[in-house]
Amino acid sequence: MRDLGMDAQLMSLCDVYDPDYKKVIDESVSSFVAQFKGNPWLIGYFVSNEPSWINNETRLCQMILNGTERPIKKALETYLAKNGDTVPNRRRFILETFDTFLSTVSEALKKYDPDHLNLGIRFGDPDTLGEDLLEVCKRHFDVFSFNCYQLKPDAAMLDRAAQILDLPMIVGEFHFGTIDRGLAQSLWQVDSQAERGVAYRYYVENAYSHPNFIGTGYFQWCDQDITGRFDGENYNCGLVDVTDRPYRDLVNAVSESSHNLFQIHSGESRPYDRQPKNARGHELVPDLWNE
């Protein structure tokens, strides 16, 4: 979703102390969901993606205090004067602000499109999210979402999130790529197009073996341009290339897994157990162009 009042100067937090914030969210949600109401192919809406204030609450509070006069600054000054300027209290203020924001968005979604789900915010690694933050999410989300660039979602990580949240879970982003088409390595890379298919099946089928798991969002449909997107990222991460030619090994793997997911999720079948050879995260290896 867009235009919900999340402010770059607040590290993607919303100033819920502004008297117009409810109106902004209400109008934005109403306008955005109008095009999707009644669409049976849509399951729900993501509210946001990887907010940068997560685990930076103390820093964000200092930025607010050092910043220009605005409603959230006055509210923070009042809160700290009453409760004490401590690290826990700064975090508590940010989480209470976040709670108010999520509550307002949730109310608007139920008002304007009650037939679709609130898929929450696509966080990063759930293990980096405190239990207090997860409890806030639990109150407002229908589904807990996170991006997960790993060989597969860690079972212990999923168990922890499931125990705290008791919600279904979706991976918002993951992918595998290689460099044989002249593009850069992806956030998780393998040695060939064939291994991309192996990696896909291993990731998705093992994810679906968890009882709380209901979906994986592959990033992305099409390769990125060789000249790069706005930040220069130019990965071989697509199901198709930039001229819409499918990567057959990957597409066949998607089809194969899709036929097995219900049986895997119900425990009737075991997930694919062949790991891709030499799969590695982007940050762990040198650029393969230099090898």
Predicted regions and their residues:
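Active-site clefts of carbohydrate-active enzymes
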Residues: 2-15, 80-89, 124-125, 130-131, ...
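Polysaccharide-binding and catalytic clefts of secreted carbohydrate-active enzymes
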Residues: 9-16, 39-132
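Soluble or luminal CAZymes and related metallo-dependent hydrolases
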Residues: 13, 17-28, 86-101, 153, ...
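Proline-centered flexible-loop/turn and helix-kink motifs
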Residues: 38-40, 114, 165-166, 211-212
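Substrate-binding cleft of secreted/luminal carbohydrate-active enzymes
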Residues: 42-44, 49, 174, 188-240, ...
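Short, solvent-exposed loop/turn and secondary-structure capping segments
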Residues: 55-60, 181-182, 228-229
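Aromatic-rich peripheral "rim/lid" segments of glycoside hydrolase catalytic domains that contact
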Residues: 62-77, 219-291
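Glycoside hydrolase catalytic-domain groove-lining segments
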Residues: 92-107, 111-186, 201, 205
